[in-house]
Protein backbone atom coordinates (compact mmCIF):
# COMPACT_ATOMS: atom_id res chain seq x y z
CA UNK A 1 0.00 0.00 0.00
CA UNK A 2 1.28 3.48 -0.91
CA UNK A 3 -0.70 6.08 1.06
CA UNK A 4 1.52 8.82 -0.42
CA UNK A 5 3.88 8.72 -3.42
CA UNK A 6 7.00 8.07 -1.31
CA UNK A 7 5.70 6.12 1.69
CA UNK A 8 4.73 2.48 2.05
CA UNK A 9 2.56 0.46 4.42
CA UNK A 10 2.82 -3.32 4.71
CA UNK A 11 0.28 -5.42 6.60
CA UNK A 12 0.78 -8.77 8.34
CA UNK A 13 -2.38 -10.58 9.43
CA UNK A 14 -1.85 -13.20 12.08
CA UNK A 15 -2.72 -16.82 11.41
CA UNK A 16 -4.86 -17.09 14.55
CA UNK A 17 -7.47 -14.71 13.21
CA UNK A 18 -8.50 -11.12 13.89
CA UNK A 19 -7.61 -9.20 17.02
CA UNK A 20 -5.99 -5.91 17.85
CA UNK A 21 -3.79 -3.96 15.42
CA UNK A 22 -0.43 -2.36 16.15
CA UNK A 23 1.64 -0.19 13.83
CA UNK A 24 5.44 -0.09 13.82
CA UNK A 25 6.91 3.00 12.19
CA UNK A 26 10.26 3.75 10.55
CA UNK A 27 11.06 7.09 8.95
CA UNK A 28 12.99 6.55 5.72
CA UNK A 29 13.92 9.97 4.32
CA UNK A 30 17.44 11.33 3.86
CA UNK A 31 18.96 14.77 4.48
CA UNK A 32 20.48 17.34 2.09
CA UNK A 33 23.95 16.67 3.51
CA UNK A 34 27.07 15.55 1.63
CA UNK A 35 28.28 12.45 3.45
CA UNK A 36 31.86 12.40 4.70
CA UNK A 37 34.53 10.81 2.54
CA UNK A 38 35.98 7.42 3.39
CA UNK A 39 32.89 5.72 4.79
CA UNK A 40 32.38 2.20 3.47
CA UNK A 41 28.63 2.77 3.19
CA UNK A 42 28.81 6.29 1.75
CA UNK A 43 25.79 7.66 -0.16
CA UNK A 44 26.02 7.38 -3.94
CA UNK A 45 23.74 10.39 -4.43
CA UNK A 46 25.62 13.72 -4.42
CA UNK A 47 24.48 16.11 -1.70
CA UNK A 48 22.06 13.65 -0.11
CA UNK A 49 22.70 11.11 2.64
CA UNK A 50 21.25 9.16 5.55
CA UNK A 51 23.04 10.92 8.38
CA UNK A 52 20.17 10.69 10.85
CA UNK A 53 19.94 6.91 10.86
CA UNK A 54 16.74 6.55 8.89
CA UNK A 55 18.35 3.92 6.68
CA UNK A 56 18.98 1.95 9.86
CA UNK A 57 15.35 2.41 10.88
CA UNK A 58 14.19 1.02 7.54
CA UNK A 59 16.57 -1.94 7.81
CA UNK A 60 15.40 -2.77 11.32
CA UNK A 61 11.73 -2.56 10.40
CA UNK A 62 12.32 -4.87 7.44
CA UNK A 63 14.08 -7.26 9.81
CA UNK A 64 11.17 -7.04 12.24
CA UNK A 65 8.72 -7.79 9.43
CA UNK A 66 10.76 -10.84 8.40
CA UNK A 67 10.87 -12.12 11.97
CA UNK A 68 7.15 -11.62 12.58
CA UNK A 69 6.32 -13.23 9.25
CA UNK A 70 8.12 -16.37 10.44
CA UNK A 71 5.84 -16.34 13.50
CA UNK A 72 2.66 -15.58 11.57
CA UNK A 73 0.86 -18.77 12.56
CA UNK A 74 1.27 -17.91 16.25
CA UNK A 75 -0.06 -14.35 15.97
CA UNK A 76 -3.61 -13.22 16.62
CA UNK A 77 -4.24 -9.76 15.26
CA UNK A 78 -2.53 -7.50 12.75
CA UNK A 79 0.80 -5.72 12.48
CA UNK A 80 1.19 -2.75 10.16
CA UNK A 81 4.62 -1.55 9.09
CA UNK A 82 4.81 2.17 8.31
CA UNK A 83 7.73 3.24 6.12
CA UNK A 84 7.27 7.00 6.44
CA UNK A 85 8.56 9.75 4.19
CA UNK A 86 9.52 13.36 4.97
CA UNK A 87 10.12 13.27 8.71
CA UNK A 88 12.80 15.94 8.29
CA UNK A 89 10.58 18.37 6.38
CA UNK A 90 7.89 20.34 8.23
CA UNK A 91 5.07 19.77 8.76
CA UNK A 92 6.16 16.16 8.17
CA UNK A 93 5.13 13.05 6.30
CA UNK A 94 3.42 11.48 9.31
CA UNK A 95 0.57 13.99 9.13
CA UNK A 96 0.14 13.22 5.42
CA UNK A 97 -0.03 9.50 6.16
CA UNK A 98 -2.60 10.09 8.91
CA UNK A 99 -4.66 12.18 6.49
CA UNK A 100 -4.45 9.32 3.98
CA UNK A 101 -6.09 7.02 6.53
CA UNK A 102 -3.25 4.72 7.58
CA UNK A 103 -4.42 4.68 11.21
CA UNK A 104 -7.85 3.30 10.41
CA UNK A 105 -8.31 0.31 12.69
CA UNK A 106 -4.93 0.80 14.40
CA UNK A 107 -4.99 0.45 18.19
CA UNK A 108 -1.41 1.48 19.04
CA UNK A 109 1.81 2.66 17.45
CA UNK A 110 5.53 2.25 18.23
CA UNK A 111 8.36 4.44 16.96
CA UNK A 112 12.12 4.06 17.35
CA UNK A 113 15.17 6.25 16.68
CA UNK A 114 18.92 5.62 16.82
CA UNK A 115 20.94 8.08 18.87
CA UNK A 116 24.37 8.34 20.51
CA UNK A 117 23.69 5.95 23.36
CA UNK A 118 25.69 2.76 24.04
CA UNK A 119 25.31 0.21 21.26
CA UNK A 120 22.05 -1.72 21.59
CA UNK A 121 20.76 0.20 24.62
CA UNK A 122 16.99 0.73 24.63
CA UNK A 123 16.04 3.97 26.36
CA UNK A 124 12.42 4.51 27.40
CA UNK A 125 11.26 8.02 28.23
CA UNK A 126 9.13 7.81 31.36
CA UNK A 127 7.58 11.27 31.01
CA UNK A 128 4.70 11.69 28.55
CA UNK A 129 6.49 14.27 26.37
CA UNK A 130 9.37 12.53 24.64
CA UNK A 131 10.02 15.16 21.93
CA UNK A 132 9.21 18.84 21.52
CA UNK A 133 7.20 21.01 19.18
CA UNK A 134 9.06 22.52 16.24
CA UNK A 135 7.89 25.86 14.88
CA UNK A 136 9.40 28.80 13.06
CA UNK A 137 8.82 32.47 12.41
CA UNK A 138 10.43 34.59 9.70
CA UNK A 139 10.56 38.35 10.28
CA UNK A 140 11.27 40.67 7.36
CA UNK A 141 12.28 44.09 8.66
CA UNK A 142 11.53 47.01 6.38
CA UNK A 143 13.72 50.02 7.15
CA UNK A 144 14.97 52.78 4.87
CA UNK A 145 18.31 52.39 3.18
CA UNK A 146 20.95 55.07 3.26
CA UNK A 147 24.66 55.69 2.91
CA UNK A 148 26.79 54.06 5.59
CA UNK A 149 28.11 57.49 6.57
CA UNK A 150 24.61 58.93 7.13
CA UNK A 151 22.66 56.51 9.36
CA UNK A 152 20.54 59.43 10.58
CA UNK A 153 19.01 59.68 7.10
CA UNK A 154 17.58 56.17 7.15
CA UNK A 155 16.06 53.49 9.33
CA UNK A 156 18.68 50.82 9.97
CA UNK A 157 17.09 47.34 9.75
CA UNK A 158 20.30 45.73 11.04
CA UNK A 159 20.09 47.66 14.29
CA UNK A 160 16.39 46.83 14.56
CA UNK A 161 17.10 43.16 13.95
CA UNK A 162 19.92 43.09 16.49
CA UNK A 163 17.63 44.44 19.19
CA UNK A 164 14.96 41.91 18.19
CA UNK A 165 17.40 39.02 18.55
CA UNK A 166 18.52 40.18 21.99
CA UNK A 167 14.93 40.64 23.14
CA UNK A 168 13.89 37.23 21.82
CA UNK A 169 16.61 35.60 23.88
CA UNK A 170 14.91 36.88 27.05
CA UNK A 171 11.45 35.51 26.26
CA UNK A 172 11.96 32.13 27.91
CA UNK A 173 14.05 33.20 30.91
CA UNK A 174 11.73 36.06 31.85
CA UNK A 175 8.37 34.42 31.21
CA UNK A 176 8.56 30.67 31.85
CA UNK A 177 9.58 29.11 35.17
CA UNK A 178 12.71 26.94 35.44
CA UNK A 179 11.99 23.32 34.63
CA UNK A 180 9.37 24.16 32.02
CA UNK A 181 11.23 23.46 28.81
CA UNK A 182 11.24 25.98 25.98
CA UNK A 183 13.92 27.30 23.66
CA UNK A 184 13.87 30.26 21.26
CA UNK A 185 16.73 30.26 18.76
CA UNK A 186 17.16 33.02 16.18
CA UNK A 187 19.11 31.07 13.55
CA UNK A 188 19.03 33.30 10.47
CA UNK A 189 20.06 36.95 10.18
CA UNK A 190 20.47 38.22 6.64
CA UNK A 191 21.01 41.83 5.57
CA UNK A 192 22.95 43.95 3.11
CA UNK A 193 25.53 43.23 0.43
CA UNK A 194 27.81 46.29 0.53
CA UNK A 195 29.90 47.59 3.42
CA UNK A 196 29.08 51.25 2.72
CA UNK A 197 25.31 50.82 2.42
CA UNK A 198 22.74 50.53 5.19
CA UNK A 199 20.18 48.27 3.50
CA UNK A 200 16.45 48.67 3.15
CA UNK A 201 15.61 45.30 4.65
CA UNK A 202 16.84 42.52 6.90
CA UNK A 203 15.50 39.05 7.59
CA UNK A 204 15.49 37.06 10.81
CA UNK A 205 14.55 33.38 11.07
CA UNK A 206 13.57 32.00 14.47
CA UNK A 207 13.20 28.36 15.49
CA UNK A 208 11.41 27.62 18.75
CA UNK A 209 10.38 24.52 20.66
CA UNK A 210 8.47 23.52 23.77
CA UNK A 211 6.61 20.55 25.20
CA UNK A 212 3.13 21.99 25.70
CA UNK A 213 0.53 23.52 23.40
CA UNK A 214 -0.04 26.33 25.92
CA UNK A 215 3.60 27.39 25.83
CA UNK A 216 3.68 26.87 22.08
CA UNK A 217 0.88 29.40 21.58
CA UNK A 218 2.57 31.79 24.02
CA UNK A 219 5.86 31.70 22.09
CA UNK A 220 4.12 32.40 18.78
CA UNK A 221 2.39 35.42 20.32
CA UNK A 222 5.40 36.75 22.21
CA UNK A 223 7.92 36.47 19.37
CA UNK A 224 5.56 38.37 17.09
CA UNK A 225 4.92 40.99 19.79
CA UNK A 226 8.65 41.52 20.32
CA UNK A 227 9.25 41.91 16.60
CA UNK A 228 6.44 44.43 16.13
CA UNK A 229 7.24 46.50 19.21
CA UNK A 230 10.98 46.76 18.53
CA UNK A 231 10.28 47.72 14.93
CA UNK A 232 7.79 50.37 16.02
CA UNK A 233 10.30 51.98 18.40
CA UNK A 234 12.68 52.54 15.48
CA UNK A 235 10.10 53.54 12.89
CA UNK A 236 10.50 50.32 10.91
CA UNK A 237 7.84 47.95 9.64
CA UNK A 238 7.75 44.15 9.68
CA UNK A 239 6.24 41.30 7.72
CA UNK A 240 5.89 38.20 9.87
CA UNK A 241 5.34 34.67 8.59
CA UNK A 242 4.90 31.76 10.98
CA UNK A 243 5.03 28.04 10.23
CA UNK A 244 3.44 25.65 12.70
CA UNK A 245 5.46 22.46 12.45
CA UNK A 246 5.07 19.21 14.33
CA UNK A 247 3.58 18.94 17.79
CA UNK A 248 5.33 17.43 20.79
CA UNK A 249 5.21 13.64 20.90
CA UNK A 250 3.08 12.75 23.91
CA UNK A 251 3.30 9.10 24.87
CA UNK A 252 0.50 7.01 26.33
CA UNK A 253 1.22 6.06 29.97
CA UNK A 254 0.09 2.47 29.47
CA UNK A 255 2.35 2.11 26.44
CA UNK A 256 5.27 3.50 28.46
CA UNK A 257 4.67 0.86 31.13
CA UNK A 258 4.37 -1.85 28.49
CA UNK A 259 7.64 -0.79 26.87
CA UNK A 260 9.44 -0.84 30.23
CA UNK A 261 8.17 -4.32 31.01
CA UNK A 262 8.86 -5.73 27.55
CA UNK A 263 12.35 -4.25 27.38
CA UNK A 264 13.25 -5.79 30.74
CA UNK A 265 11.93 -9.15 29.54
CA UNK A 266 13.75 -9.36 26.20
CA UNK A 267 16.87 -7.21 26.63
CA UNK A 268 19.92 -7.73 28.85
CA UNK A 269 19.61 -5.77 32.10
CA UNK A 270 22.46 -3.44 31.15
CA UNK A 271 20.76 -2.63 27.83
CA UNK A 272 17.65 -1.00 29.30
CA UNK A 273 17.56 2.58 30.59
CA UNK A 274 15.06 5.33 31.27
CA UNK A 275 15.16 9.02 30.46
CA UNK A 276 13.16 12.24 30.37
CA UNK A 277 13.00 12.83 26.63
CA UNK A 278 14.93 15.08 24.31
CA UNK A 279 14.82 18.66 23.11
CA UNK A 280 14.57 17.70 19.45
CA UNK A 281 11.35 17.21 17.54
CA UNK A 282 9.71 14.35 15.68
CA UNK A 283 6.63 14.23 13.48
CA UNK A 284 5.82 10.83 15.01
CA UNK A 285 3.65 13.10 17.15
CA UNK A 286 1.02 12.98 14.38
CA UNK A 287 0.53 9.27 15.07
CA UNK A 288 0.71 9.71 18.85
CA UNK A 289 -2.06 12.33 18.74
CA UNK A 290 -4.45 9.75 17.29
CA UNK A 291 -3.59 6.39 18.91
CA UNK A 292 -1.79 5.29 22.11
CA UNK A 293 1.91 5.36 21.28
CA UNK A 294 5.42 5.02 22.64
CA UNK A 295 8.69 6.29 21.15
CA UNK A 296 11.91 4.42 21.93
CA UNK A 297 15.53 5.53 21.71
CA UNK A 298 18.05 2.94 20.50
CA UNK A 299 21.76 3.31 21.11
CA UNK A 300 23.82 3.34 17.94
CA UNK A 301 27.17 3.96 19.60
CA UNK A 302 29.01 6.51 21.73
CA UNK A 303 32.29 8.34 21.28
CA UNK A 304 33.93 5.85 23.63
CA UNK A 305 32.74 3.05 21.36
CA UNK A 306 34.17 4.72 18.27
CA UNK A 307 31.11 6.69 17.16
CA UNK A 308 31.81 10.34 18.05
CA UNK A 309 29.46 12.01 15.59
CA UNK A 310 25.88 12.92 16.43
CA UNK A 311 22.85 12.72 14.17
CA UNK A 312 23.01 15.10 11.16
CA UNK A 313 26.82 15.23 11.17
CA UNK A 314 28.27 14.30 7.74
CA UNK A 315 30.11 11.36 9.32
CA UNK A 316 27.26 10.07 11.50
CA UNK A 317 26.62 6.35 11.35
CA UNK A 318 25.26 3.86 13.88
CA UNK A 319 26.99 0.60 14.67
CA UNK A 320 25.16 -2.19 12.84
CA UNK A 321 25.40 -4.19 16.04
CA UNK A 322 22.37 -2.24 17.26
CA UNK A 323 20.15 -3.57 14.49
CA UNK A 324 19.29 -6.86 16.19
CA UNK A 325 18.41 -4.99 19.37
CA UNK A 326 16.04 -2.80 17.37
CA UNK A 327 14.42 -5.81 15.72
CA UNK A 328 14.11 -7.56 19.08
CA UNK A 329 12.35 -4.69 20.84
CA UNK A 330 10.07 -3.85 17.89
CA UNK A 331 8.98 -7.46 17.44
CA UNK A 332 8.56 -7.98 21.17
CA UNK A 333 6.40 -4.86 21.49
CA UNK A 334 4.17 -6.04 18.66
CA UNK A 335 3.78 -9.56 20.02
CA UNK A 336 3.17 -8.36 23.56
CA UNK A 337 0.51 -5.89 22.49
CA UNK A 338 -1.32 -8.46 20.38
CA UNK A 339 -0.98 -11.50 22.64
CA UNK A 340 -1.05 -9.94 26.11
CA UNK A 341 -3.71 -7.21 26.13
Can you name each region flagged by the protein language model?
Residues 1-4, 50-56, 277:
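Active-site nucleophile and cofactor-binding loops and adjacent substrate-binding regions
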Residues 23-25, 137-139, 295-300:
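Non-cysteine beta-strand/loop elements that form the S-adenosyl-L-methionine
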Residues 159-341:
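Metal-dependent amide/peptide-bond hydrolase catalytic core
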Residues 12, 141-143, 208:
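Hydrophobic beta-strand positions in extracellular immunoglobulin-like domains
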Residues 1-18:
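A non-catalytic alpha/beta surface segment that caps or lines the substrate-entry region
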Residues 20-23, 78:
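Residues that mark the start of a beta-strand
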Residues 31-49, 55-56, 61-62, 68, ...:
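Histidine/acidic-residue-rich, glycine-tolerant segments that coordinate divalent metal ions
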Residues 10, 24, 54, 81, ...:
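Divalent metal-coordination and catalytic microenvironments
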Amino acid sequence: MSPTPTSRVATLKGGKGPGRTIALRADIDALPVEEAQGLECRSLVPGVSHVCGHDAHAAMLLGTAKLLLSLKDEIQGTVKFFFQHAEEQAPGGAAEMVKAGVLKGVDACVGLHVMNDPIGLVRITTTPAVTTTCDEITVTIKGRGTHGSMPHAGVDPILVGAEMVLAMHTIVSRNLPPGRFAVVSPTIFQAGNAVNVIPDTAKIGVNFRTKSEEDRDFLFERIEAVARSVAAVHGAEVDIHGVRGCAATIQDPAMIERALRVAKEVMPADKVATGTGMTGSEDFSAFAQKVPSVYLILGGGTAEEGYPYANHHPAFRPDEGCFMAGVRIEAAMALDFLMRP
